[in-house]
Swiss-Prot record:
Keywords, in A-Z order: Cell membrane, Cell projection, Cytoplasm, Cytoplasmic vesicle, Decarboxylase, Golgi apparatus, Lipoprotein, Lyase, Membrane, Neurotransmitter biosynthesis, Palmitate, Phosphoprotein, Pyridoxal phosphate, Synapse
Protein name: Glutamate decarboxylase 2
Name of encoding gene: Gad2
Cofactor: pyridoxal 5'-phosphate
Effect in UniProt of substituting C45A: No effect on glutamate decarboxylase activity
Residue positions, PTM Phosphoserine: S3, S6, S10, S13, S17
Membrane protein topology class: Lipid-anchor; Peripheral membrane protein
PANTHER family: GLUTAMATE DECARBOXYLASE 2, GLUTAMATE DECARBOXYLASE-RELATED
InterPro entries listed in its UniProt record: PyrdxlP-dep_de-COase, PyrdxlP-dep_Trfase, PyrdxlP-dep_Trfase_major, Pyridoxal-P_BS
Example of a GO biological process term: chemical synaptic transmission
Length: 585
């Protein structure tokens, strides 16, 4: 294991584990030896201690090992201001950190050095000369490092090395040339908020254990409902572990609204329920139906037009078919920003149909909800205010660190009635404050992570206008890419017309295929192009873009932009890199 006294780590050169008042001990000499750099100090310490006194392998008592690693504070200040260079991580374990006696100084030093690793990673994430990914195949990583869990603890030097190794092979999702997922970017205020949230380490189920966070969730959800267009921000909502769970919440509440007895008696007490969503919608709708006992066969996929938008006439036709069979339509899930095409279903037309047949209307705006922050683009969600529930993921288009997904419900109190179980050890009715702030009983979870603070703090730092500028920039970059490649040799668009969102879908056609007729052989060969280029991107580590087939369309690239760090130059680079990597195919 490399010494922390050299190279990347630069943790300092002194070991404070010795007893300064007893210079005759090996420990005191070790402290002197630690003044040598380049790892020599650690080697000298090993010689001075001998094999029998190595803290990690000695096999001696816990007390003797702790004494060997003891770090004494001499500054008498709170917090401790002793130089971190006095700490030798090779001689320390997690048990030497707080709440250990005299654990303050090594704790501060250790966390500061973890922070240094993180900060270097943050800086590298925005450096275009660094790789987006240092790709290794799974078997290579498994063979190159020992990832197994052991019975005996490792020292803190090794723990810091694990931190470095983990980040070395992690995807730099904040890199300006990472376009692979809907969630990209690395916001500094959001990152700081996430660190604070983890430090507070509390749960969101009652006001008494999360007073500030519960209030911030109340304020933030109300603001989001106002932006949707519900009068005065009325309604309800909750932050959940992602858009898939938010969509399942909507399905759960819609079912309860129509058949409240299902909560106690189960699906056997209700007729067969049918949900409707577009054929381009997110797979989470079917997952939710499976989890809730409704069944995937009870999710009817509605046809889309060539741009990926739900066709209202087909929706109404399928509703009538279901009703004629004696089944009960209970939910229509429209999509505002589909995952692949970035399409926006015609919400006003869908709302009219839902009103006509008295069906719960849900809008999955996990990807497109961020456009509500933009005066220029929010028209694409016209009609969202007529929905009964909305999924909105700020961790996507708004760049909030994962995870941050909200379900907003128009009817106040419905979520509480649907999910509450009155656990008396948490939700006592005789508390000395307003019990409406004990939000945990309306959630499916008991333990619930604090997801709101990242969004709230970013909103305070950026303002609504800052989010608007972020979103407008990303959509402008998508239009820039579209305008470059729509008539460029070697590119074919998957659908005609300017994209509505930042999704730009296209094929790159290598020179060898450009002369072929548009037939089955050409399509078969074209389907193999995107996977090979993507693999080469990852091998070189220069950029990342997703690809997929859809319906009768063979593998194509789906470019999405949600990272405000991206520029026109990064789009130019992407085009050139695709051409470089695909010319010989």
């Amino acid at each position: 294991m490399a010494s922390p006294g050299s190279g990347f780590w630069s943790f300092g050169s002194e070991d404070g584990s010795g007893d300064p008042e007893n210079p005759g001990t090996a420990r005191a000499w070790c402290q002197v030896a630690q003044k040598f750099t380049g790892g020599i100090g650690n080697k000298l310490c090993a010689l001075l201690y001998g094999d029998s006194e190595k803290p990690a392998e000695s096999g001696g008592s816990v007390t003797s090992r702790a004494a060997t690693r003891k770090v004494a504070c001499t500054c008498d200040q709170k917090p401790c201001s002793c130089p971190k260079g006095d700490v030798n991580y090779a001689l320390l374990h997690a048990t030497d950190l707080l709440p250990a006696c005299e654990g303050e100084r090594p704790t501060l030093a250790f966390l500061q050095d973890v922070m240094n690793i993180l900060l270097q990673y943050v800086v590298k994430s925005f450096d275009r000369s660094t790789k987006v990914i240092d790709f290794h195949y799974p078997n290579e990583l498994l063979q190159e490092y020992n990832w197994e869990l052991a019975d005996q603890p490792q020292n803190l030097e090794e723990i810091l090395t694990h931190c470095q190794t983990t980040l070395k092979y992690a995807i730099k999702t904040g890199h300006p040339r990472y376009f692979n997922q809907l969630s990209t970017g690395l916001d500094m205020v959001g990152l700081a908020a996430d660190w604070l949230t983890s430090t507070a380490n509390t749960n969101m189920f009652t006001y008494e254990i999360a007073p500030v966070f519960v209030l911030l969730e109340y304020v933030t959800l109300k603001k989001m409902r106002e932006i949707i267009g519900w009068p005065g921000g009325s309604g309800d909502g909750i932050f959940s572990p992602g858009g898939a769970i938010s969509n399942m919440y909507a399905m759960l509440i819609a079912r309860y609204k129509m058949f409240p007895e299902v909560k106690e008696k189960g699906m056997a007490a209700v007729p067969r329920l049918i949900a409707f969503t577009s054929e381009h919608s997110h797979f989470s709708l079917k997952k939710g139906a499976a989890a809730l006992g409704i069944g995937t066969d009870s999710v009817i996929l509605i046809k889309c037009d060539e741009r990926g938008k739900m066709i209202p006439s087909d929706l109404e036709r399928r509703i009538l078919e279901v009703k004629q069979k004696g089944f009960v339509p209970f939910l229509v899930s429209a999509t505002a920003g589909t995952t692949v095409y970035g399409a926006f279903d015609p919400l006003l037309a869908v709302a009219d149909i839902c009103k006509k047949y008295k069906i719960w209307m849900h809008v999955d705006a996990a990807w497109g909800g961020g456009l509500l922050m933009s005066r220029k683009h929010k028209w694409k969600l016209n009609g969202v205010e007529r929905a009964n529930s909305v999924t909105w993921n700020p961790h996507k288009m708004m760049g909030v660190p994962l995870q941050c997904s909200a379900l907003l419900v128009r009817e106040e109190g419905l979520m509480q009635s649907c999910n509450q179980m009155h656990a008396s050890y948490l939700f006592q009715q005789d508390k000395h404050y307003d019990l409406s702030y004990d939000t945990g009983d309306k959630a499916l979870q008991c333990g619930r992570h604090v997801d709101v603070f990242k969004l709230w703090l970013m909103w305070r730092a950026k303002g609504t206008t800052g989010f608007e500028a972020h979103i407008d920039k990303c959509l402008e970059l998508a239009e820039y890419l579209y305008n470059i490649i729509k008539n460029r040799e070697g590119y074919e668009m998957v659908f005609d017309g300017k994209p509505q969102h930042t999704n730009v879908c296209f094929w790159f056609v290598p020179p060898s295929l450009r002369v072929l007729e548009d037939n089955e052989e050409r399509m078969s060969r074209l389907s193999k192009v995107a996977p090979v280029i993507k693999a080469r991107m990852m091998e070189y580590g220069t950029t990342m873009v997703s690809y997929q087939p859809l319906g009768d369309k063979v593998n194509f690239f789906r470019m999405v932009i949600s990272n405000p760090a991206a520029t026109h130059q990064d789009i130019d680079f992407l085009i050139e890199e695709i051409e470089r990597l695909g010319q010989d195919l």
